[in-house]
Amino acid sequence: MRADRPIGTFLLLWPTLTALTIAGNGKIEIYLLIVFCIGAFLMRSAGCVINDYFDQDIDKKVFRTSTRPLATGKVNNFEALSLFVFLLSLSALLLIFLNFLSFLVATSLAILVSFYPLAKRIMKIPQIVLGIVFS
């Protein structure tokens, strides 16, 4: 989940809060601020979990990532996937506070979050997927 490294959540929040500010003519409703802050944390965490799941064999060989829980065996595949589903489920619960268009966008982005680790294997520039997710 990398909760100890909040920079990823902040990177997700930057464009989100900018869009909310523009959409609200300079004002962000407090409930939207709460929903989107929690959502950014949950989805960034879900993205980290699924990325670590798909990259665990690579992570074992790279010094920077060799201590990640899946790479070391501290967490098994079932636990990681269960956490991923749990984080996605919590994120989905947040959608009850938003409109249908937000639901469609969020669902599409959840698919892209799940696809990014695989995109690294089949695309020359998988950062495009991340760029779409982060925007």
Whereabouts are the PLM-identified features?
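Residue-level signature of catalytic and energy-coupling elements of molecular machines
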Residues: 1, 55, 126
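Hydrophobic alpha-helical transmembrane segments of integral membrane proteins
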Residues: 2, 11-12, 113, 122
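Short, cationic motifs built from Arg/Lys/His that form the positively charged side of catalytic pockets
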Residues: 2, 65-68
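The first (N-terminal) embedded transmembrane alpha-helix
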Residues: 3-22
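Hydrophobic, aromatic-rich alpha-helical transmembrane segments
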Residues: 5-9, 25, 29-33, 37, ...
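Membrane-embedded alpha-helical segments that form the functional core of polytopic membrane enzymes
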Residues: 16-17, 21-54, 64, 88-92, ...
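Intramembrane alpha-helical segments
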Residues: 68-135
